[in-house]
C-alpha cells in the first residue's frame, strides 16, 4: 500500500527544483469578497445517530449528493491530499474525486478536483509551480495541499525562502484545519517501555527522520526526561536512538524482518572507535503500518499516539496568499462547506459511511468499509496476544476549527503552541538543516475563518469535541519533575519559574487527550504533616497557574506527597534540592 509521506524530511532538496519567478503585484481589492452565500440545508429532520454526535436534537441530515459531476462553472481548484482519514470532511463535502451535483462544494460554487499525492515532496513542488503559474496567469486553476500541522515549521522554512523572489503576496499561508489524527499516528514499543520509560534508554526506534510520527516520539521522550540521539548513524546507550526509514511501511517492515545495522558508539557526545550492531526495538508509524506490526509480528504496544497528543496533528490546508485573497469569497464558502461536512460526519452514520466510500474512490484503494473502520479506530489482538489500538481520526466542525486556531471561548491557540513546540524541537536537533523557521503569524492566516465565524454564527452551534478526563490517573503516559521555585515556606511561585510553568502549559495543550497530574514533593526537613500540607499547597498553586492559562480545571488532579517519595539522598544538599520538586504526570 502507498503511504502518507509527510513534509518535514526531504523538503529542502525538493524545493531546489523551483526556477526563476517574475516580480509583480495585483491588489485583491478589486476582487474583494461580498457576503458569503450560506449553504442550503436539504434533507429530512432526524435524530443524530452517530456516537458523540456534534449536532443535537432534531438536527438536519443533509441529502447525500449524487454521483453526477457538477457543472456549476465556479472556481476550479486542484486539492492535493495524502491517504489520510482526517480529511473525511473534504470527502463528504465534495461528493467524489470531482465535485458532484448537490454536494456542499457544489452549493459553494467551486469545482474541486481531489488528487491523491502521498509524496509530500511532490505536493510541495506542485505548490511552488502553482505560485509561479499564477503569477504569470491569474486564470490558473488554484492548488491547495493538506499536510500535518506539526510538520509545518520545516515545510514553511523551506518554502517561504524559495518563494521570496515573488514577494509577500505569493507566500504560502495555512487557512483552515478540517480534522486531525486521533490515534492512528503512534509510537509502538515493547510493553516494558510503557511500564518504565527509563527502559527505553539504549533502545532504537525506526521512523522517517524529522517527520510527524518522529515528533510523537520526541514529545514522549521529552515528557519523560529522556534524551534522543539525533544522529541516525551512531549509537548512544544513554539515549533513544533513531533508525532511518524511507517511508511509513519501511519503518514497521524493519522491525518485522529483523533489520540490523552497524553503528559507531557515542559516549558523552564523542564518537568512539568501537562499533556495535543494533536492531529495531520500536517503530513510529501510522495506519496501516501499525496493522502490519500487529498482524505480521506483534510484540509492540502503543506507548503514545495522537489519541493522547490530541492537538499535535491537525490536517491543515495551505495555498498561496495571493490566490486566497483574490478568491476570498470562495475560500470562505469552502470553509463553510467543510464545517457543515464535519458536523454531518460527526453526527450521522450514513454521512460518515459516505465519506469512507468517497475516500476509496479518491485513493483508488480498498473499499469504503476499510477507510471507515480505520477512521473510527479499533482494538485488536496482535500475533502475540497483546491488545493493540489501530487507526483513529476525527473531523472538525466550525467550533473545533475555531478552537484549534485560538478563536474559541478559552482563547487557547492550540495550533500556535503545536507549531512553535515542534519548530523549536527540529531547530534544536537539526540546526544545520533548519536554524530558524517562519513566525506563526506570518504563515497562518486566520482572517478567512474569523469572517465565517462572525458572519455565520449558526455554524458554531455544533458541539466541539470533548474529552472525558479521568479524575484519578491510573495509566501514566509520561512523568517529569520540575524545579519550580517558591518563596521560602510558602506556596507563592517566584516569577523566575513562570517560563517553566508556561512550558508545562504548552506540553499539556499538545497532549490534550490526557489528564494532568500535579504532584508536590518536599525534602525531609521539618514536620511531616507540615511538609505534606505545603507540598499540596504548592501543587495547587501550579494548578491555578495552568487554569489561568486556559487548561480546564476538570483536567487537573492535585496531590501532595510531602517527603514520602524522595528521588535523591536527603542527607546531602544536592539531594534535598532534587527532592523539592513538582512532578507533572500526563495520563488517563
Describe the residue ranges of each PLM region.
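Periplasmic peptidoglycan-binding/tethering modules of Gram-negative envelope proteins
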Residues: 436-515
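Hydrophobic membrane-insertion alpha-helices, especially the h-region
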Residues: 12-25
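Hydrophobic single-pass membrane-insertion segments
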Residues: 22-36
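Secondary-structure end/capping motifs
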Residues: 326-432
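Pocket-lining segment of extracytoplasmic ligand-binding domains
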Residues: 147-151, 241, 245-370
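Short, glycine-/small- and polar/acidic-enriched structural segments
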Residues: 38-261, 265-266, 273, 281-287, ...
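N-terminal Sec-pathway targeting helices
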Residues: 2-15
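Periplasmic OmpA-like peptidoglycan-binding domain that tethers envelope proteins to the cell wall
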Residues: 521-588
Amino acid at each position: 500500500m502507498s503511504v502518507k509521506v509527510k513534509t518535514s524530511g526531504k523538503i529542502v532538496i525538493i524545493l531546489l527544483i523551483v526556477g526563476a519567478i517574475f516580480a509583480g503585484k495585483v491588489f485583491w481589492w478589486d476582487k474583494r469578497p461580498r457576503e458569503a452565500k450560506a449553504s442550503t440545508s436539504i434533507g429530512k429532520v432526524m435524530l443524530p445517530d452517530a456516537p458523540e454526535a456534534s449536532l443535537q436534537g432534531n438536527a438536519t441530515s443533509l441529502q447525500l449528493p449524487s454521483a453526477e459531476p457538477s457543472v456549476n462553472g465556479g472556481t476550479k481548484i486542484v486539492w492535493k491530499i495524502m491517504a489520510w482519514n482526517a480529511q473525511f470532511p473534504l470527502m463528504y463535502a465534495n461528493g467524489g474525486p470531482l465535485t458532484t451535483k448537490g454536494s456542499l462544494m457544489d452549493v459553494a460554487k467551486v469545482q474541486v478536483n481531489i488528487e491523491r499525492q502521498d509524496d509530500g515532496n511532490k505536493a510541495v513542488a506542485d505548490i511552488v509551480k502553482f505560485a509561479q503559474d499564477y503569477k504569470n496567469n491569474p486564470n490558473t486553476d488554484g492548488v491547495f495541499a493538506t499536510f500535518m500541522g506539526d510538520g509545518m515549521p520545516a515545510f514553511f522554512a523551506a518554502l517561504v525562502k524559495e518563494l521570496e523572489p515573488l514577494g509577500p503576496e505569493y507566500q504560502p499561508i495555512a487557512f483552515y484545519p478540517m480534522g486531525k489524527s486521533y490515534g492512528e499516528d503512534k509510537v509502538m514499543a515493547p510493553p516494558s517501555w510503557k511500564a518504565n520509560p527509563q527502559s527505553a534508554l539504549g533502545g532504537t526506534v525506526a521512523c522517517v527522520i524529522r517527520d510527524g510520527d518522529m515528533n510523537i516520539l520526541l514529545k514522549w521522550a521529552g515528557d519523560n526526561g529522556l534524551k534522543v540521539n539525533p544522529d541516525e548513524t551512531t549509537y548512544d546507550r544513554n539515549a533513544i536512538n533513531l533508525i532511518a526509514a524511507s517511508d511509513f511501511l519501511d519503518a514497521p517492515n524493519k522491525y518485522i524482518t529483523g533489520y540490523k545495522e552497524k553503528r559507531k558508539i557515542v559516549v558523552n557526545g564523542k564518537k568512539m572507535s568501537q562499533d556495535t550492531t543494533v536492531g529495531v526495538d520500536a517503530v513510529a508509524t501510522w495506519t496501516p503500518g501499525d496493522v502490519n506490526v500487529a498482524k505480521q509480528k506483534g510484540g509492540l504496544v502503543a506507548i503514545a499516539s495522537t489519541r493522547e497528543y490530541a492537538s499535535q496533528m491537525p490536517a491543515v490546508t495551505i495555498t498561496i496568499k495571493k490566490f486566497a485573497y483574490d478568491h476570498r469569497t470562495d475560500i470562505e464558502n469552502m470553509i463553510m462547506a467543510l464545517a457543515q461536512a464535519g458536523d454531518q460526519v460527526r453526527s450521522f452514520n450514513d454521512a460518515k459511511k459516505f465519506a469512507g466510500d468517497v475516500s476509496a474512490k479518491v485513493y483508488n484503494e480498498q473499499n469504503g468499509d476499510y477507510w471507515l473502520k480505520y477512521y473510527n479506530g479499533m482494538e485488536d489482538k496482535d500475533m502475540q496476544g497483546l491488545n493493540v489500538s489501530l487507526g483513529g481520526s476525527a473531523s472538525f466542525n466550525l467550533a473545533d476549527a475555531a478552537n484549534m486556531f485560538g478563536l474559541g471561548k478559552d482563547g487557547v491557540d492550540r495550533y500556535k503552541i503545536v507549531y512553535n513546540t515542534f519548530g523549536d524541537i527540529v531547530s534544536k536537533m537539526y540546526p544545520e538543516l533548519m536554524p530558524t523557521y517562519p513566525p506563526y503569524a506570518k504563515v497562518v492566516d486566520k482572517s478567512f475563518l474569523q469572517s465565517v465565524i462572525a458572519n455565520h454564527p449558526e455554524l458554531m452551534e455544533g458541539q466541539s469535541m470533548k474529552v472525558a478526563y479521568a479524575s484519578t490517573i491510573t495509566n501514566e503516559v509520561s512523568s517529569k519533575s520540575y524545579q519550580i521555585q517558591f518563596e521560602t515556606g510558602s506556596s507563592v511561585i517566584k516569577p523566575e519559574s513562570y517560563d517553566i510553568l508556561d512550558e508545562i502549559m504548552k506540553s499539556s495543550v499538545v497532549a490534550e487527550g490526557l489528564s494532568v497530574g500535579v504532584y508536590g514533593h518536599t525534602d525531609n526537613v521539618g514536620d511531616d504533616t507540615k511538609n505534606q500540607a505545603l507540598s499540596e499547597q504548592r501543587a495547587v498553586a501550579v494548578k491555578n497557574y495552568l487554569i489561568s492559562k486556559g487548561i480546564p480545571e476538570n483536567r487537573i488532579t492535585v496531590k501532595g506527597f510531602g517527603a514520602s517519595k524522595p528521588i535523591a539522598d536527603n542527607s546531602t544538599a544536592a539531594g534535598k534540592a532534587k527532592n523539592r520538586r513538582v512532578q507533572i504526570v500526563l495520563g488517563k
